């Protein structure tokens, strides 16, 4: 079975042959698969391995937010053409043992509710996640791999970039293209590639 395996001791920037952290139509596929072929993909966490067990919120001061939300791939499906509908079945998902939740003032979906700084570490075992920072609570394991999507077309990139820039101009929040810590790091992908954090029409 074809696969993309992750060395969890290395950041994406140090292992760029396994993924990307920008959306762009010119990012080269890492592997090719035939329709119906199974593939094994390992994924990094949303921080690209920067949040480690035992860290405190204060340790996140040097956290590189622009390198976050790395994706594994791309995977090219042989015969697929722009505009095709792809059906992808996720046969099995396996969770890592460590997870985390962070709340930063002024950030995230609940920024208007929570104004405290907080970092919880989760241990996933026996079908539940438990955190010493939130004693007495266990959450049923609900494995979520993050984002899956298809490469945007050049036209989609331009439209989405304009839409998000307009949102920022009107006082909203969006992560605009930024070459800092982009993977792949070469141009024009680095400076024009869309950040992988927000959901869009491609995935």
Regions found by a protein language model. Give the residues of each.
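N-terminal, Lys/Arg-enriched amphipathic/low-complexity engagement segments
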Residues: 1-63
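A short, solvent-exposed, low-complexity linear motif enriched for acidic/polar residues
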Residues: 2, 8-11, 18, 24, ...
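Short, conserved secondary-structure segments in the cores of folded domains
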Residues: 29, 71-76
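Loop/turn positions that initiate beta-strands
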Residues: 36, 80-83
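A generic structural signal for residues embedded in beta-strands
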Residues: 41, 85-88
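Short, charged beta-turn/beta-strand-edge "cap" motif at the junction between a beta-strand
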Residues: 44-48, 91-96
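Short, compositionally biased
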Residues: 52-68, 99-113
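Intrinsically disordered, low-complexity linker/loop segments enriched in Gly/Pro
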Residues: 92-203
């Amino acid at each position: 079975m074809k696969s993309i395996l992750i060395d969890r001791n290395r950041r994406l920037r140090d292992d760029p042959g396994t993924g990307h952290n920008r959306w762009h139509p010119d990012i080269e596929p890492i592997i090719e698969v035939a329709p119906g072929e199974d593939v094994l993909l390992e994924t990094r966490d949303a921080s690209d391995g920067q949040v480690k067990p035992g860290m405190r919120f204060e340790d996140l001061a040097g956290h590189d937010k622009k390198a976050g939300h790395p994706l594994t791939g791309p995977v090219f499906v042989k015969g697929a053409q722009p505009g095709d509908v792809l059906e992808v079945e996720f046969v099995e998902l396996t969770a890592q043992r460590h997870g985390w939740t962070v709340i930063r003032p002024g950030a995230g979906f609940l920024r208007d509710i929570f104004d405290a700084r907080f970092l919880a570490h989760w241990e996933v075992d026996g079908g539940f996640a438990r955190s010493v920072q939130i004693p007495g609570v266990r959450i049923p394991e609900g494995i979520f791999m993050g984002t899956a999507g298809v490469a945007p077309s050049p036209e989609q990139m331009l439209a989405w970039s304009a839409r998000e820039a307009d949102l920022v101009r009107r006082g909203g929040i969006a992560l605009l293209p930024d070459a800092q810590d982009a993977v792949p790091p070469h141009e024009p992908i680095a400076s024009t590639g869309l950040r992988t954090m927000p959901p869009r029409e491609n995935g």
